[in-house]
């Protein structure tokens, strides 16, 4: 034995001596160009080799270590409710935000307080977005300005945005990346502190096996210092800022410096989509001709253990995109997560290739135990997601759908849904629709009906999906296809929710109610503006653009980003050209303002939308600077676009996040989504159907606030939110202001109250009839065939959204509009019921139908 040991030792010693020179040589070459060249060639070989994955769709899940990791993740998920990878947590402090004013203000405060890290995941991010309004007096609160300040202070900022298919969408994530990464140029404070990833990759040569054209990264969340998170439906982008009165008009005769929505932030997707968003100043939609499309949304602010889970989802996505797209890019490091070290680092996508490029950086940057995530509040919560191989490198996770289905199926009193879409199935017979949240609605209604129990499902969705075009036109077939799937989900065909309930001997009209939201306003194009245009030779539309150029200057951005790249707005030549155009525009604006006369001061306000809210007096008393017949031409209406993705059940449970109610969001392997399921353990005395009831504070106060907004029982909001608790980040010292200081709070306490339901339905009917009478708002139950459009709407080419009968007396219009309170209208369930809404063709066919569901 000893002889063998000696022999082996001598052999080993000889081998070491022979190897030693090569190891020493390898160490010496490690940091040289020769070594870099070798690594580059090695990575190039693997890059070219990715074409082989065309024949192996399971290439991320077929190696032994990948299989082991998948089994580990599945084992974790199988132990959790809804089969979510993330566990349930007690002790969360969660605050709700309704509409963009409050949310963006709170985000601006939270970002400004960041000390270590900021994570942002968005479908679309507009660097030039103003988080506070009006922009002219809030220059320092532009998103890119805030991020620049934090980067210069040493905060590490990580951003992941969806890389759009340019032919289909106008998000221009390339501009987002270059604009953000140019904020801190080389040799300046903050250099390298802002990193932006775009995904998925559309480079055929590098990513042929994993091309994703149909599906998007749709999450919208922020994590700050591992101490606070925001999650919901609001991207940090144009078109989302709004307040509770949801104004349509933004014309200011007293001076364009008072504008609220500059440049492309003033948008109406139903008339014209965003265009060339890298030129954020440009806006082809004239404010003196059209109203904007108002925006309703909901989000959450989180402090507590769920913050870690939201951060973990971001870290997994970051490392997955690093592996998938930036594996050979030293500018992007791997993120290691405290709590997922060692043998568990694969759970967050950390890889250890033979020739790693980029460092391995532990996060958070200070010890996790210093973050004080435990026992922060009273909300029991859980993160759920839609995620899969293409989006996160994991097996399919559809825990959002599981959560929706289970929570709805178990509802006892009511289900309240606000969502951008409503496309769902009741079984396996509604291809191409696969999610079966609709079956849960059927089951809950049938059970209640057979038990003789009062039970309501209240659904609020947009009247029309937010795509441009006249619904009569052939080009709108894609929009009509989405609407067709929604009607088939709700009430058309034997497999619809209505008919499945009716087949069980229960009347669906006693249980299911579907609504839209709609807003009106008056464009403040006064005679004074027309006179200024005549005297100056400058149209107000030009002044509108000049104002956007002045306050949305690109001067904050560098001429190149940190990668030495640029987009169309960057570079010396472009800067010089832009400067000349800006000077020309500003001179035109100056001529226009010089043409204003002191005796032409205006009394009419830029918007009268506040009259739909509480405590605002009568619209009949609102001043107008001009002849009555001129005012008639200036009234406009538009759908109030519901972009919220919120479910509230029985005043106890809330689900909120980025997930729409359709296959794209719910199936897991389509769009990627992140949502949070919440139930407050802090119970407050309440009433349910006339009986004493213990409601969850978080769910009940959110539902009461939303319902009062929709009924017009809340006051309008000022732009300045500095003294509003609802516009502050979550914290023990900034709870939600539930607005319980008038009788309306008590009025909406019982969601099943007959008195409340009578006002809800009566006001919806009044609003619907008013918009029909004055504007012939489209869509409408009077339009059952395409021929009906010839009677109901003005001829093609006539401006949409204005008063239908221009000969109506101005006073009659005001009196009618004074009856509109809130924004609630009935969804027209008979719209085009006798027509083929979506003819099969190039846009809608068996190859493309899944895109619309």
Sequence positions of predicted segments:
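Long, serine/threonine/proline-rich intrinsically disordered regions in eukaryotic cortical polarity
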Residues: 2-65
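N-terminal alpha-helical scaffolding segments that mark the starts
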Residues: 23, 27, 34, 60-63, ...
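HKD-type phospholipase D/PLD-like phosphodiesterase module
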Residues: 72-117, 124-407, 414, 418, ...
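Domain-scale recognition of functional cores that engage charged ligands
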Residues: 435-443
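Long mid-to-C-terminal assembly/interaction modules of large eukaryotic proteins
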Residues: 521, 530-532, 538-555, 609-620, ...
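Catalytic core of tubulin tyrosine ligase-like
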Residues: 652
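Glycine-rich phosphate/pyrophosphate-binding beta-alpha loops
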Residues: 660-666
